[in-house]
Amino acid sequence: MGFSSIWHWIIVLVVVLLLFGAGKIPRLMGDVAKGVKAFKKGMADDEDDEAASVSAERRGIEDGKPAQTIYPPQQPQQPQQPPQQPPVHRDDAPRG
């Protein structure tokens, strides 16, 4: 036997009414509803903030200042030297 019987639900309802009283249940439900509304509002605010930051990044503006483009450091170019020829050895010894 599970909680599918109507008698189980009636007994649970009576116990809840005895524990909390008839006046406390509507206040409890009102507090739950306020909590749900605050949660939804917070989620909507987060989505708006995220959308605003994404659109600011697309425009290249963050906090009202233009974004700076950062380039990778460039290595100084060294002038190209012509390839060196191997030294010429002359024999000072007489031939012949």
Swiss-Prot record:
Keywords: Cell inner membrane, Cell membrane, Membrane, Protein transport, Translocation, Transmembrane, Transmembrane helix, Transport
Lineage top rank: taxon: Bacteria
Record localization: Cell inner membrane
Ranges annotated as spanning the membrane: 1-21
Topology of the protein relative to the lipid bilayer: Single-pass membrane protein
Region of interest called Disordered, as start-end residue ranges on this chain: 42-96
Function: Part of the twin-arginine translocation (Tat) system that transports large folded proteins containing a characteristic twin-arginine motif in their signal peptide across membranes. TatA could form the protein-conducting channel of the Tat system.
This protein's name: Sec-independent protein translocase protein TatA
The organism of origin for this protein: Rhodospirillum rubrum (strain ATCC 11170 / ATH 1.1.1 / DSM 467 / LMG 4362 / NCIMB 8255 / S1)
